[in-house]
Each structure stands twice: as structure tokens, then as C-alpha cells.
């Protein structure tokens, strides 16, 4: 049975299949290798992909886009609230959790983000099965570096509910390195690789250290305010200005007209990655008036000049953070659909004039290809080119902090796994309390979010101090096992948290 890799992005999804020693992205039923992560509800029907995206103008209130922004979030989470404000589909509060309000015509139903994601994963499963002519279950799923435990679990559960057996969650920079077999071509000595990802709604830059086939994340930076859609919006605003100049009508405040211009701008943006000019035509843009405008690549680059500069700045700040110069970087890997833009590639080349820029695999396909190769490793495909000594060293995406609370209510915070800690890792922490102590409550936080707690109660009073030893073991996949033991009595409690905070 073949193994597959699935990249579930903010705006698009893509699936790659590992078979006969190689990984390849496969096309969906529309012939496209990338599928819009868009789900539309119409009567009793659910539509996924390009048809849902194209029909959004007429069915915006029942069309869900960018569901990944809200996966694993509570309703009052700031990111969920930002998604609610942006979404044309109404987001409501149901028992503290976000739900999409869908009008089916006869009734109103409330759909969870996980159920929306399930439909997208199912589309990826169907795509892979159609290409292979057989059922597929085993899959490696990609996740952003900064995803927390709740987001990872939500993504995993959505994939499993779609029928996948999730072999592993792999972080996007690691998948990009695996796709290019980095670490095997020069297995001896230390090198540095920069992974640049410009997706639909976010920009991330990651620096990894490669040493004898072992990958270790040094640092990453993510900007959720900048992505490929930022370029589309700039171009759409330009088209609106051109329409106003020609027809003396301002459509910038008309949601329906601007959605049409966004669609046209998106097509033009993709065209300009391969051609020198693009023709934008919108039928009946406003008040029955058609609109046509030609945009050259040079004009597009001028319109988006400030955005291009904004996309380069994180590279400079990240290198400064890890005390590396551009000459210390040996390779740059491009990923994300908008990393195809020629101007952006040229600016990165100018920044790294003597560094190999890897873009032979289409940037929007490199991450699922790497995920499929990881899947091939995990199911034991002997024909895989990567050697068994090729290891991705996962690390904590954010701090794991322990909060202790004793009988008196005293709170003590200790960071046990700082962000960037290589995994697997083990930490031991000792708390000394008075003999009268009857219980200890420990809470675990990822960044500032509580993820679990453990209570050691019914401690016997004693004359000397209580020694309470807490041992935390975090595996490569981010699962965290915690044991809390009172030393003199041997009384102990233990918990396990799945996929707590790993990043690879």
C-alpha cells in the first residue's frame, strides 16, 4: 500500500504519493495539482475545491475559506475573533467553541471547523486514491512550526475522521529539506539551510543546522499578516483604481465587485509568474459594466514594491537572531505557492549571491513531496533514497512551563523546555515543601496556554520536608509524559499529553 503526504495549507491543499522509490504530487479531478482549501454548502451538498472557490461570489455566506486559521481555537481566542471578522460565513459561539452558521434554505445548521477540515482531507484522500487506483490510509500530515497542542490535535482528528491513519505530523521546514534530500549529499560537516515559505496568508522563515545527516531547527519567524493574498489585494486595489479612472465609479467599498476583482487579480498574479503581462477581464463588474485591464510584470512589481521589501526583512532579522551572516548559509529552499514570484526569487538571490537557491521542485509542491518521503520512511520503503541515518531533530516550538501550587496558594513558574529545545529531551524538577503539605498541583503551559495539570494528593504529614520530584520526558513527536513522585512515600501520579509542542 502506498504512503502519502498531505499539506493542508491556509488557502490550498496538496497531496503527494510515495511509490516506487519516489514522491510525486498528484492532480485532482479538475486536473490541478493544488486544490483550494475552500468548502461551500449548498442545500444538502458540500462542494470542495475550485468549484467552491469559483462559486463564492454568489454563495459567500455559505462558503468557508481559511478554516486552518480557526482549527483548535476557542471562540474567544484572538485568532478566532480575527477570522470571524474576516469571514463572509457567519461564525458563532457554541459552548465556547466557534461554529460556522450555514443556511441550507430550509434550516440553519452549525458546522465545526474540524468538520470543514475533514471534507478537505477527504478530498485529498479521494485525489490520491484516484491516482493510485486503490485505497490509501497511511499519511504524514504537515503542520506549521508554531501550531500548539490543540491545533495539532484538531488537524490530526480531522484527518483521521476523513479515513487517514496519521503516521506522523511533520513540520513544514523539515518536509522541505527531505524533499531535496538535504543532508545526504554532504553528510560530513556542519551546514546551514534557510527555508523560506510564502503561502497564501503567511510568511515564515526558518534556519536549520544540518550536521552528518541530522537536521536541527535553530530559529523561525512567522508573519501572519503577509502572504500571497497580500499581493492579490494590492493588485485588486490597483484594478479598482483603474476602473474608477475609466468609469468614474468607486467600487472599493462594494464587497461583491471587490471579490470579482480579487478573483481576477489572483489569476493575473499567477500568470505573471510565467509571462510578462496578464489580461484582467471581469464580466459585469458593476452596474452591467464590463472591465478589462492589462497589467505588465513590471507594473505588478511596482504596485507591490513595499510588499516585496516586507517579504525580505524577516530573512535579515532571523539571521541576526541566530548570529549568522548570509555567507554562513549554504542553501536556501523556497516553498509556498507565492515563492514562485520571479521578483521575490531575484531579491533572495541578490541577498545570497553565492548560495544555492533550491526551487527545482515547484515551491507549492515541495512540502507535500517531503511529507510523502517521510511517509515512505515510516512505512519502511527500502527503495527510498534517504539513508536511515537521515534524522530530523524536532524541537519545542514554544516554551513548556511548569506551574506549582502548594497548600498556601504559592505559585512557582519554571521553564523546563525553552523554545528550540532539541527533542527527545528529559527534565527533572524537585519541589521541597513543608511536612504539613497535603497536596501539590502542577500545571503545564505551552507559551501562555494551559495544556494539562497533575495533582499529587493525600500526602502524609511528616516532620521533615516533602521532596516531590517531577520528571518530564518529551518525545520527538512532541508527546509529553509527566511523572510526579513524593520520594519518602513513593506516592506517584502520571499523565501523558499527545503532541504537546514539537516542531521539526
UniProtKB/Swiss-Prot annotation:
Keyword set, alphabetical order: ATP-binding, Chaperone, Cytoplasm, Nucleotide-binding
Keyword hit for Transmembrane helix: no
Major location category of this protein: cytoplasm
Swiss-Prot/TrEMBL GO biological process terms: chaperone cofactor-dependent protein refolding; protein refolding
Highest taxon above the source species: Eukaryota
Subcellular location: Cytoplasm, Cytosol
Gene Ontology CC: cytoplasm; cytosol; nucleus; plasma membrane
Record GO terms (molecular function): ATP binding; ATP hydrolysis activity; ATP-dependent protein folding chaperone; heat shock protein binding; protein folding chaperone
Keyword DNA-binding: no
Transmembrane segments: none
Function noted in UniProt: Component of the ribosome-associated complex (RAC), a complex involved in folding or maintaining nascent polypeptides in a folding-competent state.
Family: Belongs to the heat shock protein 70 family.
PANTHER family, alphabetized: HEAT SHOCK PROTEIN 70KDA
Quaternary assembly: Component of ribosome-associated complex (RAC).
Protein's name in the database: Heat shock 70 kDa protein 14
UniProt organism field: Danio rerio
Organism lineage string: Eukaryota, Metazoa, Chordata, Craniata, Vertebrata
Gene expressing this chain: hspa14
